[in-house]
Each structure stands twice: as C-alpha cells, then as structure tokens.
Amino acid sequence: MCSSDLATSALRTAYRNRLLGIVADDLTSPDPYQHVETVGRRMSDLADAALDAALLIARRAVGPPARDTALAVIAMGKTGARELNYISDVDVVYVVAPAEGRQVPEEELLAAGTAIATELAAVVSSTGAEPPLWPLDTGLRPEGKDGALVRTLASHVAYYQRWASLDRKSVV
C-alpha cells in the first residue's frame, strides 16, 4: 500500500468517525425536525474538511507539477448551501491559478490542475481499503460534463458572462 493509499484510508476512517458523532446527535435529538439544519451544516462542514484533506493527499500524489499550481475546490449545490444530507453527493467546481509567485504557462497549469482534481476525486470516491465517502459530482461546471474539468478564473468569468443561463448565474 503506497502512502497516498494509507492517507486515503486514514481520511475515510476519520470522516466516518466524525460522521458517527453527527448521526448519534441526530438520533438522540429531542426534536429531529428542529435539528435538520444543524445536521446539514455539520455534514457540509465535515465534507469541506474532507475535501481540504483530500486536496492535500492529491497534491502530494501528483508531485512536482502541483507545487506551481493553486487549485480552489468550490462547493456547490447542497454542500455549498450547507444543506448536505446522508445520501447527498458532493458538487464541486474547480478553479486553477499559478501558485503565489509562480508563472506557469496556461497549458501546464490546466494539466496540473486536472491531475490534482482527478486524484482528489479518486481519494474521496474510488474503491479502496475503506469505502468511498460520497460521489463527487463535477457536472455543475461550465458546459457540464462536456466542459473542461478545471478552468482558470478568467475562463469561468468569460463563460458566465457570455453563455450562462440565469439559473447558472444565480449559482455564482
């Protein structure tokens, strides 16, 4: 087992341990309906923390190209609204930029960002020693599943200014 596999298993185990705490609080709540928003927020915060950890694991797995690349993982949908539930997938959009103080050709930047994003998806969603956390959905990105997995901020802005429908603009 390589170090990223060990880190992935550790992340998944830690996630499930914290999820069990949320479940226990949920099941013992005197008024479960009053508790729904709290559960959604806590689960979304846990997913955000898992994405942060998965990003670190992914960056390490990608290696040197990741050093010059900053990748933002933007939570969308129920995760972004802090309304995650027990059966939700996690919607994300990726924005890539050169790491601070670095100058990277856009083609290399996009390749490194895509490698990191692909590895991040494997960390949270692929089969392994520990079960996956949840499906990671990148379909809310510009042009949906037909669009680039990773874009620069300028590319996102240009898309939304030119092509986005009103419902997509309201998401941003």
Residues covered by each model-derived region:
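A nucleotide- and high-energy phosphate-metabolite-utilizing enzyme signature
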Residues: S4-V172
